[in-house]
Amino acid sequence: MSRVQLALNVDDLEAAITFYSRLFNAEPAKRKPGYANFAIADPPLKLVLLENPGTGGTLNHLGVEVGSSNTVHAEIARLTEAGLVTEKEIGTTCCFATQDKVWVTGPGGERWEVYTVLADSETFGSGPRHNDTSDGEASMCCDGQVAVGASG
């Protein structure tokens, strides 16, 4: 099964969970500190909420969840053939899951991932969960973007 993923930055995770639970008449499929996702059947949507205070209501990234690693690898080949620069992450841990994925960047800077979940993880991943840092320095977030801290 394939479905579109929409990852949103939210100021208040609990308020966002309450709102989206009511909107889609569904409970989160996964809930961790600073993170939640919904696996909506109709319309087919993976909604990801990332608590990033001060950036609420903004897009974090977009994606397409696919059913297998073979599909991710086929997309890597297709996107490369189409002349798009790709960033591959195979067996990476991100968003409390081990995943195979490929990233591309749209002309407006919007980040898209094509990914499959291999297994759940108890850790968020190699990058910090939040875009903000206490010292205002840039930090890597899960989607590979460099984000500047709230005071920077």
UniProtKB/Swiss-Prot annotation:
Gene symbol of the encoding locus: cadI
One BP annotation, GO: response to cadmium ion
Positions in coiled-coil regions: none
A UniProt-annotated Pfam family: Glyoxalase
Provenance organism: Mycobacterium bovis (strain ATCC BAA-935 / AF2122/97)
Residue intervals of the VOC domain: 2-117
SUPFAM superfamilies found in the cross-reference section: Glyoxalase/Bleomycin resistance protein/Dihydroxybiphenyl dioxygenase
Induction: By cadmium.
UniProt name for this protein: Cadmium-induced protein CadI
